[in-house]
Amino acid sequence: NFFSHFFVDFQPKKPSFNAALIAPDILRNFTPSQSKLHFDHFQQITSKGQPQEDPILNDFFNGCLQHIQRDKEFHQSALFQEIYQLQRSNWQLMCPKLKIPRFWFTLHVVIEIMIDSYLINNHLEKLQLFYTTLESQQETYRTALELMGHDQIDHFMERYTRFYTNQYLFHYQDLERVGFALHKIHEQVKLDSSWYIPNNIEQLALWKSTYADVCLVLAKYPLEMKPIR
């Protein structure tokens, strides 16, 4: 749910904070062995009055910490729980039928992807801002990784550049691509992904059903982005 983090916690005139709102996730995805970093420590040592005071990096590490806090809140939120309960029995039935593994994990991931899809469909211009912000903060990421002692910086930055250049999230306007994204996540975490069949009618019906409930619940709990000033 990269875009959701950016959308919900966006801060005007704080580009390093905004770019860092996805940092914990992309660190885990791009460099798994270098993802368990103590963001709170680096937030403290870059704060005002400290020997390594740096307002841009301090904003960056605050963005990392906000991501972690938002994840904790989201998983306990009424929004997530209501979508989960609406789709739980459907996914319990369909996962074995479609040979999709790990029902609970998979539904959790799909809900997050579908929320991104909903926000993209309704705020497409903000997705372009998301990618523009990431591109503008390449050097901030590199400097932050150097401070944290990350030992795969070039590899991370190569993946980071590819991420904002390819702009894959625009494909989330097509629910078929949501299924493809889920299949790639299963590959990444070493789960069986052979279940995925492009344009499969039963799979697409499951994505559509889930998206409909996401739309229903988000109408009840609307997410808003702070005005860009």
Label the predicted regions.
Residues N1-F105, N199-R229:
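An N-terminal structural lobe/cap that precedes and organizes the functional/catalytic core
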Residues Q11-P12, S16-F17, F60, M114, ...:
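Bulky hydrophobic/aromatic packing residues
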Residues A19-N29, F105-N121, F180-K184:
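Short, hydrophobic/amphipathic alpha-helical patches that form generic packing surfaces
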Residues L65, Q69-R70, F74, A78-L79, ...:
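Hydrophobic/aromatic-lined pockets within catalytic cores
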Residues S77, L119-K126, F130, Y168, ...:
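Long, hydrophobic, amphipathic alpha-helical segments used as structural scaffolds
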Residues A78-Q81, Q87-R159:
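Active-site-proximal alpha-helical scaffolds that flank and shape metal-associated catalytic sites
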Residues Y131-A219, L223:
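An amphipathic alpha-helical core segment
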